[in-house]
C-alpha cells in the first residue's frame, strides 16, 4: 500500500468558478477562475469526506499541486477518493492519466471542441456546471462562438433571446 499523505502537507487548489468561490470554514476566498489558495491535506480531505465533496467532484475547486516531492497528483486524487470524476474529466478532455486538471483544461476544451463534443460533455453531471459557467464567461469575453453558448443555454433550459436580453439590460 502506498504511503499516506501527511495531514499537514500543503496542497494548492485552483478555482473552477468564473465568479468568486469561498469556503469560510477554511478561510479561503477565490475571486476568479484560476485563482489559487493553499490548504493542508487534512483540510482538503475533510472537504472530500463531507457533504461538501461536491466542490471537488464538480470542479468548483481543483487540487493542482502537492507541495511534497514524494507524492504526485494521482496519489492525492486516490487518497481523496476522487478517481471517478477525475478519470471521466480526463477522458472527456482528451488528457493522459497523469495530466492535472486545471481551469485551463476546461477553457482549452471549450475553445477547441466542436459543438457536438461540447454537447456530449455537458451530459456528464460532474462537468456540466463548470462547462456551462466557463462557456458563458468566455462568450462574454468574445472568446467562443454563439453556437457554443446556444448549446450550453439549451442544456440548461435557458432561452437564448432571454439570455441576450438580460445581458444587455
Model-based region annotation:
Residues 2-85:
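Compact, well-ordered interaction domains used in eukaryotic information-processing assemblies
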Residues 83-169:
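Charge/polar-rich, low-complexity and marginally structured segments
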Amino acid at each position: 500500500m502506498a504511503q499516506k499523505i501527511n495531514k499537514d502537507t500543503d496542497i494548492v487548489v485552483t478555482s473552477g468558478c468564473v465568479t468568486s468561490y469561498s469556503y469560510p470554514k477554511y478561510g479561503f476566498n477565490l475571486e476568479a477562475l484560476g485563482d489559487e489558495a493553499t490548504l493542508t491535506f487534512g483540510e482538503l480531505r475533510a472537504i472530500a469526506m463531507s457533504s461538501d465533496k461536491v466542490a471537488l467532484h464538480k470542479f468548483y475547486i481543483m487540487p493542482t499541486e502537492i507541495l511534497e516531492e514524494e507524492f504526485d497528483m494521482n496519489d492525492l486524487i486516490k487518497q481523496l477518493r476522487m478517481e471517478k470524476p477525475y478519470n471521466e474529466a480526463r477522458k472527456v478532455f482528451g488528457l493522459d492519466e497523469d495530466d492535472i486538471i486545471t481551469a485551463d483544461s476546461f477553457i482549452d476544451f471549450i475553445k477547441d471542441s466542436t459543438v457536438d463534443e461540447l454537447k456530449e460533455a455537458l451530459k456528464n453531471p460532474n462537468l456540466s456546471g463548470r462547462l456551462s459557467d466557463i462557456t458563458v464567461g468566455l462568450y462574454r469575453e468574445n472568446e467562443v462562438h454563439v453556437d457554443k453558448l446556444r448549446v450550453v443555454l439549451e442544456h440548461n433550459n435557458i432561452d437564448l433571446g432571454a439570455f441576450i436580453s438580460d445581458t444587455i439590460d
